[in-house]
Design a protein with these regions (language model features):
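Short, small-residue-biased leader/transition segments that mark boundaries at the very start
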Residues: 3-8
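Small-residue-enriched alpha-helical segments and adjacent helix-cap loops
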Residues: 9-18
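Glycine-rich active-site/cofactor-binding loop and its immediate structural neighborhood
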Residues: 20-59, 63
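Short cysteine/histidine-rich metal-coordination sites, predominantly Zn2+-binding motifs
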Residues: 29-33, 74-76, 102-108, 144-146, ...
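Short Cys/His-rich zinc-binding micro-motifs
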Residues: 48, 126-128, 156
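Iron-sulfur cluster-binding cysteine motifs and their immediate structural context
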Residues: 53-73, 84-101, 122-128, 132-150, ...
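Solvent-exposed, charged amphipathic helical/linker segments at domain boundaries
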Residues: 97-116
């Protein structure tokens, strides 16, 4: 079964309390439609819109929008890693990745390529591209490209020093 080797990750950590609303959208409650019309109700143009296109396409009832965070959550026991939710997300924040050892993982919960000051204003959880994680990683597993940190799962040893050093 594919599920044993793959998992779904939501690469947006901008929960409702971390991303203040800057405007209101009254159009169709569809991520695909909304993303073609505007950037979202928060200051982050890269974050989850929260309308649940990913939920609608899941044939296994494995993904839902958490009403408290406004973000998609995946039930790993139901998910078959078919990738339907990945294709449905116009913001490309849902990724299909190889499972890490013991289902542990360290990853960046942000896809914003904006500069640090813009990210900090839009979302308290966003990667500001400061590079502190790169400096503390003894395994050269982290790089910063386009103002965003990337963690190489082949090099990462799950020591979590980068997590402790991250200011966001």
């Amino acid at each position: 079964r594919r599920q044993r080797q793959m998992c779904i990750r939501d690469s947006c950590g901008g929960t409702c309390e971390k991303r203040p609303r800057t405007n209101e959208y009254n159009g169709a409650k569809s991520c695909a439609v909304a993303s073609s019309l505007y950037v979202g109700e928060t200051g982050c143009a890269f974050g989850c819109l929260g309308f649940g296109d990913c939920v609608a396409v899941c044939a296994f009832d494995a993904i839902h929008i958490n009403p408290e965070t406004g973000l998609p959550e995946v039930d790993a026991d139901k998910c078959t890693a078919c990738g339907a939710c990945v294709k449905a997300c116009p913001k490309m924040i849902i990724e299909l990745r190889k499972k890490w050892p013991k289902n542990r993982a360290v990853y960046v919960s942000c896809v914003s390529k904006d500069k640090g000051a813009v990210v900090m204003k839009a979302c308290k959880a966003g990667c500001i591209g400061c590079g502190k994680c790169v400096k503390v990683c003894a395994f050269d597993a982290i790089t910063v490209e386009n103002n965003l940190a990337y963690i190489d799962p082949q090099k990462c040893k799950l020591c979590r020093k980068c997590v402790n050093e991250c200011p966001t």
